[in-house]
Amino acid sequence: MEQFVLMIYQGTTPLPGTPEWEAMPQEEQTRVYADYAAINQTPGLTGGPPLGLPADAHTVVVKDGTTDVREGAHLGTDGAVGGFAVLEAEDLAAAIEVASRIPAARLGGAIEVRPIMEW
């Protein structure tokens, strides 16, 4: 078995409580909740804790010994990580299959599948 981190990039994925979410048909909202519930039941998957909104993030950069703190996500709202999970899977193909079921992948975001390295 191999371990992977699945990083969920929100992109333009509608978030609950936003006007974009409210504009989605109720059927799609229900499907999103059901899909995330099913993903969370995947054997070998450990979901990360919920992350706050990208607008509430602070990005820290140190240059020439000086710490600069910027408001917001490093890559902006569309490039922000919205969540993550650790997955133990047979191989990369199995990890990709799980990632493909995460709703953000079909709703304007993307899922990055990255192997966990052992040092």
Task: Map each language-model feature to its residues.
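Conserved, structured core segments of small domains
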Residues: 1-119
